[in-house]
């Protein structure tokens, strides 16, 4: 029911704004800065670095944290690309051939279909699935931190892993 939330806001005479995509952009920038631009030799090092991010650390304890979906922890990671974090679910399955040609050896995304996994494996790309809710939590936390700085009270709910930075 796409109209459930807007209709509830209207009944409650509350304003409503959807910040999902901007928050996805925030987590993509966060991961680029903290993971993609770092030097890692092996895939397990990338997984360990992700596991030190509080939202992912908590998600891991819940059984929904970052995991390797394609490849091996002992593989060289090569260049890292943050993919499928923002802009919808999945792009074209043909992107893996282009990513491999560009020297990308490891991708990090929120989720991945079996078709995409097969294409990643075909082109020897390691695929780390960071997790949807934990990744969303990073982005929304970065946004909420800014609201709190402006004096807006934040009450976490709906599965948000609230971490203040």
Task: List each language-model region with its residue ranges.
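Non-catalytic interface/targeting segments
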Residues: 1-109, 114-115, 119, 125-165
């Amino acid at each position: 029911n796409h109209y459930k939330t807007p209709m509830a806001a209207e009944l409650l005479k509350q304003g409503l704004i959807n910040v999902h995509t901007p928050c996805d952009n925030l987590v993509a920038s966060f991961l680029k800065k903290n993971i993609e631009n770092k030097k890692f030799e092996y895939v397990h090092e990338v997984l360990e670095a992700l596991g030190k991010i509080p939202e992912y650390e908590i998600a891991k304890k819940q059984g929904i944290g970052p995991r390797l979906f394609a490849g091996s922890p002992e593989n060289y990671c090569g260049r890292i690309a943050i993919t499928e974090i923002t802009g919808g679910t999945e792009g074209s399955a043909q992107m893996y051939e282009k990513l491999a040609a560009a020297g990308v050896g490891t991708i990090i995304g929120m989720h991945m279909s079996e078709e995409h996994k097969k294409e990643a494996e075909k082109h020897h790309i390691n695929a780390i699935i960071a997790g949807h809710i934990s990744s969303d939590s990073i982005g929304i936390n970065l946004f909420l931190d800014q609201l709190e700085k402006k004096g807006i009270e934040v009450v976490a709910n709906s599965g948000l892993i609230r971490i203040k930075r």
